[in-house]
UniProtKB/Swiss-Prot annotation:
Alphabetized UniProt keyword annotations: Cytoplasm, Glycosyltransferase, Purine salvage, Transferase
Top-rank taxon: Bacteria
Catalytic activity: AMP + diphosphate = 5-phospho-alpha-D-ribose 1-diphosphate + adenine
SUPFAM superfamilies xref list: PRTase-like
Class of enzymatic activity (EC top level): transferase
Protein name as annotated: Adenine phosphoribosyltransferase
One of the GO BP terms on file: purine ribonucleoside salvage
Purpose: Catalyzes a salvage reaction resulting in the formation of AMP, that is energically less costly than de novo synthesis.
Primary location class: cytoplasm
E.C. designation(s): 2.4.2.7
Subcellular localization: Cytoplasm
Gene name of the record: apt
Amino acid sequence: MSINFKDYVASVPDFPEAGVTFRDISPLMSDGEAYAAATDKIVEYAKNKGVEMIVGPEARGFIVGCPVAYKLGVGFAPARKKGKLPRETVSASYGLEYGKSTLYMHKDAVKPGQKVLVTDDLLATGGTIAATIKMVEELGGIVVGTAFFIELKDLNGREKIKDYDIFKLMEY
């Protein structure tokens, strides 16, 4: 049976501000069959890459990455916001509409030479994923691909990570 994943995405106009259409993956996550099928598609992609570790940024990267890591039998390393990790970290900043934000990872989260898949719910401007990739590489990891439920094409996030393989289930 083939699932049309877009049937499980709620499009909310004018959220969080006028002119923006928010793509809500909550319906996808709340439907066990659809969530499992979406996860399985990313698992299939990851198997072909020889993935040894999944890394995902807070918070929705966890939603995508953790079940993929579980299915593959590999670890998951979170990229967190400030003050969330108790041990020594590396960090990378990225631009926001007004200012910047910073993500952190434990220094031992990724081993040198480890093949890493970076996951998130969606690829928008690419800043979060680019920052996550920067930390993985600083730790010596090899980013073998990126995976998303959704790519928002008009925001050109692909440009920030153009040197990496990109897998997405759907695009808007």
